[in-house]
Amino acid sequence: MFTEDKVTEIFFMADEFCGFFDSRMEKYALRDHKKRIYHRESTMSKSEIMVIIILFHNSGYRCMKHFYVEQVCRHMRHLFPKVVSYNRFVELERDVAIPLALFIKKVLLGKCTGISFVDSTPLRVCRNQRIHIHKVFKGIAQRGKCSLGWFFGFKLHLICNEKGELLNFMITPGDVDDRRPLEYKAFVDFIYGKLVGDRGYISKNLF
């Protein structure tokens, strides 16, 4: 777990980023003025929610609910005095999905050391038996195959260094070949030295 000083540092960076992000969205985002938007204001800020998500992924917990209830609500109330119920927190998570991804891309990525590793992992959106009735990601998620078999959803492509620091990531539909992201210059342009992957990444186009 991070120290309180480190949590405060991450919160400061996240809060500064959210302020900039919201100002850009307010200025440039397109709006549908025909629809009346009902928006329930949250007592927790976007930056607080982002920090809690970051803390969870560094905590060793496998269940977000257990982490939120046992750690945040019990032992971190002095850091997050306006915590909401877990159900409400889950609702608020979707509001920070885009700013969190951009925050990680711009602020939290590590640096290439000359030895990097690339791999992908499936992000399932539903069980295979429910594919035909799935609506949330209909038209976006696709059937894919990994070492564990067929799945329906997306693929998370990751590059990290030998210290375990995340260097870059990309999310694609499940049917995208693992080698495809490596063909995008922006995904690997900063990588130098050796890039290690399994045999699924062998391709003439990558050499």
Task: Give names to the regions the model predicted.
Residues 1-207:
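Short alpha-helical elements
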